Amino acid sequence: MAEEQDFAQLCRLPTQPSHSHCVNNTYRSTQHSQALLRGLLALRDSGILFDVVLVVEGKHIEAHRILLAASCDYFRGMFAGGLKEMEQEEVLIHGVSYNAMCQILHFIYTSELELSLSNVQETLVAACQLQIPEIIHFCCDFLMSWVDEENILDVYRLADLFDLNHLTQQLDTYILKNFVAFSRTDKYRQLPLEKVYSLLSSNRLEVSCETEVYEGALLYHYSLEQVQADQISLNEPPKLLETVRFPLMEAEVLQRLHDKLGPSPLRDTVASALMYHRNEILQPSLQGPQTELRSDFQCVVGFGGIHSTPSTILSDQAKYLNPLLGEWKHFTASLAPRMSNQGIAVLNNFVYLIGGDNNVQGFRAESRCWRYDPRHNRWFQIQSLQQEHADLCVCVVGKYIYAVAGRDYHNDLSAVERYDPATNSWDYVAPLKKEVYAHAGTTLQGKMYITCGRRGEDYLKETHCYDPGSNTWHTLADGPVRRAWHGMAALLDKLFVIGGSNNDAGYRRDVHQVACYSCTSRQWSSVCPLPAGHGEPGIAVLDSRIYVLGGRSHNRGSRTGYVHIYDMEKDCWEEGPQLNNSISGLAACVLTLPRSLLHEQPRGTPNRSQADADFASEVMSVSDWEEFDNSSED
């Protein structure tokens, strides 16, 4: 007794925890579940504690009732749902093969499933009847690993028989990815017409051009030899031709097709597509399902800009962040403008580059404007602005594009011009109350917002809002910091003001502070600051994340190729794939690009020296600063 009292004295614990300790702790073993499985498997291997016998195809399989009930809905309903099997020592299982039942029980006891071509079908049948989603998923994955042109119809039948929508979608994806080759097989013509119609209507159909869709539609009804020899009748066109997006075909191909057709509905359709090509100026206003790109790849894209090395070079390169590779690639279209700091807008998946700087020899503002069409990789020069605008901002509101203020290197501007794609014309709308340049703008909830900038030599922190319905400007609360040559982005009901520079310290410095304006509360706040300086950056928003591309760092005294991505949910910045060159004045946007472009080998990628990557040094030479003098920032 004395020893017990001594032990109690020794082991006495405090009844009241101190403030620095929590009352309870919960511990979780990472090995418990595997140990439990090993224990259950040992019981099965030793034949211990079996309490039910499954009778399958006349053969007996002993098992543990509680484990079966815990493993799937079928056995849970049988053994815990008030059915007669609750009291039976032997339970008859119908519709399942003995081998498949052994496979499934092995999975229940071990979490392992061995599949082969000889057992996958009966295992899938059993898993569907016994309602075991994991095994169904494994069987579908195994089948997809063996799918080819010869057996795909059989797998489709299995998917239909057991209502396996996920497997059907995987089979559809297989055909969409291999359409050109598959459309030349006999199995293609054995698919139901409705299935082929659905596949040919998909934006995920992987073709290099729309002509391959046209040929694929014909190959469902005619042999390859008949199509190649033009031994087909199109007076009553096959229904599948409804899925062909004729305006996406090249005009020369359409003209040849039109010339050989007699009077027919198809000829009228082709004539409409030819008219689309001839009315190039009106194409953005003629968009519909027939002109939609067969792609779901939305990419961050950058146009133009100015490099620092080997000399000050205005870029005519367009670059995009390839979502498949996670790296930047170049694509070059003929007649691409060689500019920097252009205003940029996207309307109906056309890119508009508005005004900007052409500062190769001295300062020169631009009034010229261009439009890029990713459907045909083609540039088109649209109507010029009514006056030159450098260091402007450009926004889309509704069906119009607005070019706001800027400067012409003689005067600061307050003028605002509005572009109507339907008439290819610019008109003046209500000007700003005061001149501003090097500002930034974005659109939110049908209104246009601009922030900060410069007026003369002064840096601003002003905020203005334009209401197109009343054609009026309203002044909002000032932002928290002066800045210019920055960027703006809109997410949810918030405006983000990012990057730029000011001279609050008495000399030009980067602004790392990121300001956020709530259109609901009409108040400013600050979010996570930029990890590096970005003056004259490209800005784009994709998947609720803000991309900040390149620009100038006055703290470093150089242009940069950095890419930083802001995650609003986490309020943090991440490093993105770095640009191939140090560049400022990049005009950035988000654009749907053709699948064929993303799968092409890169061509025409400029071979710039490695010195460009190392250009972000803290100290610059006199010649470097002379190069900087040709930038938009002064």
Curated annotation (Swiss-Prot):
Primary subcellular site in the record, as a coarse category: cytoplasm
Modified sites of kind Phosphotyrosine: 466
GO biological process: cell division; cellular response to amino acid stimulus; cellular response to L-leucine; mitotic sister chromatid segregation; mitotic spindle assembly checkpoint signaling; negative regulation of autophagy; negative regulation of type I interferon production; positive regulation of cell growth
Keywords (A to Z) from UniProt: Acetylation, Cell cycle, Cell division, Cytoplasm, Cytoskeleton, Kelch repeat, Lysosome, Mitosis, Nucleus, Phosphoprotein, Repeat, Ubl conjugation pathway
Location of N-acetylalanine modifications: 2
Superkingdom per UniProt: Eukaryota
Residues that bear Phosphothreonine: 463, 475, 605
Region (Disordered): 600-634
Annotated transmembrane regions: none
Pathway in which this enzyme or protein is active: Protein modification; protein ubiquitination
Domain BTB: 50-117
Subunit structure: Component of the BCR(KLHL22) E3 ubiquitin ligase complex, at least composed of CUL3, KLHL22 and RBX1. Interacts with PLK1. Interacts with DEPDC5 (via DEP domain); the interaction depends on amino acid availability. Interacts with YWHAE; required for the nuclear localization of KLHL22 upon amino acid starvation.
Function in brief: Substrate-specific adapter of a BCR (BTB-CUL3-RBX1) E3 ubiquitin ligase complex required for chromosome alignment and localization of PLK1 at kinetochores. The BCR(KLHL22) ubiquitin ligase complex mediates monoubiquitination of PLK1, leading to PLK1 dissociation from phosphoreceptor proteins and subsequent removal from kinetochores, allowing silencing of the spindle assembly checkpoint (SAC) and chromosome segregation. Monoubiquitination of PLK1 does not lead to PLK1 degradation.
Protein name: Kelch-like protein 22
Organism: Mus musculus (Mouse)
